[in-house]
Amino acid sequence: MTTAPIDNIRNFSIVAHIDHGKSTLADRLIQITGGMTDREMAGKEQVLDSMDIERERGITIKAQTVRLNYHAKDGKDYIFNLMDTPGHVDFAYEVSRSLAACEGSLLVVDASQGVEAQTLANVYHALDAGHEIVPVLNKVDLPAAEPEMIKQQIEDVIGLDASDAVMISAKTGFGVPEVLEAIVTRLPPPKGDRTASLKALLVDSWYDVYLGVVVLVRVVDGVMKKGQRIRMMGTNAAYDLERVGYFTPKMTAVDELGPGEIGFITAAIKEVADTRVGDTITDDRKPITEMLPGFKPAIPVVFCGLFPVDADDFETLRAAMGKLRLNDASFSFEMETSAALGFGFRCGFLGLLHLEIIQERLSREFDLDLIATAPSVIYKMKLNDGSEIEIHNPVDMPDVVRIQEIDEPWIEATILTPDEYLGSVLKLCQDRRGNQKELTYVGARAMVKYDLPLNEVVFDFYDRLKSVSKGYASFDYHLTDYKPADLVKMQILVNAEPVDALSMLVHRTRAEGRGRAMVEKMKELIPPHMFVIPIQAAIGGKIIARETVRALRKDVTAKCYGGDVTRKRKLLEKQKEGKKKLRQFGKVDIPQEAFIAALKVDS
């Protein structure tokens, strides 16, 4: 393949909400430009989504790239570098880095659904990156498609001129050649100096069994060659380049990558954690002094405990997590023990979808049955002695008398919903301690902005939002800041013993409702024992809710036919003594489903 002059390179990404046809459009572009033959494409959809879970859920998790050759109508040959970015809020940082590697974006909007919350968030990311944006209306062949209305919506909501939007159906291929021409004529070429010192952006990285860590890079200035010694400026580690190349989508090795090009490098790097997304790569012999802007390490936001249902699976779980960590540096874990659940891990995630995906991959790829404890966030606590601590596990919370103030993280949520569900959506946000910031109407849809505590969102907010809006509302959020909160640690006691896996930090106003719902659920699922079992929810020494599991009754007087009443009484007293002793020393077996159900209750 020839290296084209920099003016003939176009780097672009496709921005879209989940399910609006982003990966399908990418498939068509690859097919038309001959990136893969029709035979290779046959029976294969979403070529760039390599994980099964990406295909099934119809989402893109890792950023992927493909280089395409295109012979345009003006008679020139162009090189297109297409970045397929994640569309979900949890991976917003990966999106921002992928966008930083490009100069333009195709904004794909479903002509039957319109603009969704995540479309908005990603368009703003693209505008922040200084992108030229070409609107593309997909699925125009559907009976429910309303292209003219959606064009107006794009102008009203995003403020983009959509009068010359490209009309396509990615599924059938209709209109896709016009998209290719629009990329040539409407998107700008990259800028870069071939003679300058090497400066490249680390876009993404993943682990390959044979090659070690494969790093996706965008060269800004200079040249990357095989055998060159490079330095990562964020970690200050140096490596010798072993392979340089690009994806077509197959891995293709070349001698060098020049300015404006996107490709991959391998350099015997052992761990993905050594390659931080957004880092700057330079030449070890002629280093540059300034890093590319926008680099920040991935910080976990949501935490939860993962425990194997079968204690024998602990080592398998440890190995499985190690393997996932090879490919996902933003996933962190440390060992923890729980009196109720045994050995497990405390894990950190970028957000709720990230947590779900990791859990699903553990159960699917490694065949593990897991129990997840209640998700929690990072709380900042100011203590009376003037020190500050951060905790994400309710078990680690210091004694209440030592705490001066607890601060919790807040988010700004953008929710788009059809107006008939607006009342239910507003009620849900109010119930979750939200403060409404703004409400605007776009046609028959409302856009609401709310400030919400992250603590209230991580639990089941997304599921509840989908159910109150019949699945039509879409939701996007970003962290804003920490605010003081009246939070208390609620414990669940079974037979007067605290169950550590069920402790959680809740707002004082919601503690009673939450506690009551949990103990009622536990009562249904804990089987009767030979003695009475009290199930209580407590804050400190105060019991706020209680349910009782009645004892099994064995008829000890069945053998007495007639005779004195004292005979019966003696047997009953003996049974009572035995039950008292049992209650003192007897162990209550809490079934796994009781844990799972208690953590899923809705207060």
Swiss-Prot record:
> What membrane topology is given?
Peripheral membrane protein
Tell me where in or outside the cell this protein is found.
Cell inner membrane
- Quick check: keyword DNA damage in the entry? no
Superkingdom is Bacteria
**Is Membrane among this UniProt entry's keywords?**
yes
Outline the extent of the tr-type G domain.
7-191
One family from Pfam that matches here is: LepA_C
Residues reported to bind GTP: 19-24, 138-141
Spell out the molecular function terms from Gene Ontology.
Answer: GTP binding; GTPase activity; guanosine tetraphosphate binding; ribosome binding; translation elongation factor activity
EC nos: 3.6.5.n1
What keywords sit in the KW lines? Cell inner membrane, Cell membrane, GTP-binding, Hydrolase, Membrane, Nucleotide-binding, Protein biosynthesis
GO CC field: plasma membrane
InterPro entries with a match to the protein in the record: EF-4, EFG_III/V, EFG_V-like, EFTu-like_2, G_TR_CS, LepA_C_sf, LepA_CTD, LepA_IV
Its recorded reaction(s) are:
GTP + H2O = GDP + phosphate + H(+)
Main enzyme class: hydrolase
Q: Which GO terms describe its biological process?
A: positive regulation of translation
- Gene3D superfamilies in the record: 3.30.70.240, Elongation factor 4, C-terminal domain, Elongation Factor G (Translational Gtpase), domain 3, P-loop containing nucleotide triphosphate hydrolases, Translation factors
Question: What does this protein's UniProt record list under function?
Answer: Required for accurate and efficient protein synthesis under certain stress conditions. May act as a fidelity factor of the translation reaction, by catalyzing a one-codon backward translocation of tRNAs on improperly translocated ribosomes. Back-translocation proceeds from a post-translocation (POST) complex to a pre-translocation (PRE) complex, thus giving elongation factor G a second chance to translocate the tRNAs correctly. Binds to ribosomes in a GTP-dependent manner.
Family as reported in the entry's similarity comment: Belongs to the TRAFAC class translation factor GTPase superfamily. Classic translation factor GTPase family. LepA subfamily.
Name of the protein this chain belongs to: Elongation factor 4
Q: Which organism is it from?
A: Rhodopseudomonas palustris (strain BisA53)
Q: What are the top taxonomic ranks of the organism?
A: Bacteria, Pseudomonadati, Pseudomonadota, Alphaproteobacteria, Hyphomicrobiales
